[in-house]
């Protein structure tokens, strides 16, 4: 088998799929920002982490189930592999129901905890209640895509994302600009778009005869635990930019006010797409890594990891250069004020410094959960926001306020990447003994 060709057949569609998932937030920000202004842009920025939780739950469960599916299938245990498909499907149904009820009835409290007040709280509540009602569409829309990739359908996973994305754009234009439905319209467009992605994914899985709810009751708890054990890392990895978003927004309220929040909204929309591109490399190569791991093909596993690191670094450098050259257009894209756009031009280069380091961390994390090294993947997933929070608590009061909030995110990524290199080297050394 040509490993390089197979690698890109899996990874390119995955990268594009993850890029489109990041653009979902940008689409809402674009239409709302140009319709309502800085207040609408700031509202999306504050409220989006709630949407991200729903999508991250789907991604985590989907990845957890699909990793086990690929490993067991490669080891020749097809029957057991299908139980993880069923287990993941039941988990997505359960979490969808719980999240719908929880978010809908506590949306105002959650938004307040995220830093919303006054007009932002009113607009955010309007947005999030609709998102909550469509939780099942978001969970399944993101949760079925990993299964499609592990069934060999990376191209169809990308097509499913494109269909959802195109629907989201068309409906955002219709609901927000033509009908003037503001935050409600943006939220409705988002959940319908995810619903289209879910529908395409379910049809594909049904055609492949890999859509099942059949699992022995006695095996259900153990299967669910194994799915969640693996899925915790991809859940956290997908959510990590939004954890950073919450932390930065909370402290920016004190140091930079609404202008700083709006500035970071513009930056985060763009930089998160880059982070998702890099995660697309890791998660796109995951089916191959899991298959080689399950089949005991160490050489092919190592080659796949090397390709993933190299390709993610190329993407990181190219993305950083392009964004730097176009940074003056970013604030204008979202209808921000001149002051906010000036802030984006000034601050964006700081965040671009972190991109190559994030490439290392995301591929390392994906490699660990693809090969069932769950503890190591947890360390890389959750150490970054902890380090960032500590740095934000320490540095801004002493070394310049808001500017050190920005730099704290970079320092956290550099430290996390360093840890990932150490863990990867040690893990490789252990396997080679």
Question: Could you say what each language-model-derived stretch is?
Answer:
Residues 9-28, 130, 141, 164, ...:
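Transmembrane helical elements of multi-pass membrane transporters/channels
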Residues 23-42, 111-118, 174-181, 242-273, ...:
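Helix-terminus/linker motif at the lipid-water interface of multi-pass membrane proteins
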Residues 17, 21, 25-32, 55-62, ...:
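Alpha-helical transmembrane segments and their lipid-water interface positions
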Residues 1-14, 69-136, 178-232, 289-354, ...:
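Short alpha-helical transmembrane segments in multi-pass integral membrane proteins
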Residues 2-36, 49-64, 68, 93-100, ...:
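N-terminal transmembrane alpha-helices
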Residues 41-101, 138-157, 263-321, 325, ...:
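Small-residue-rich hydrophobic transmembrane alpha-helices
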Residues 62, 131-149, 157-168, 186-201, ...:
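Short runs within selected transmembrane alpha-helices of multi-pass transporters and secretion channels
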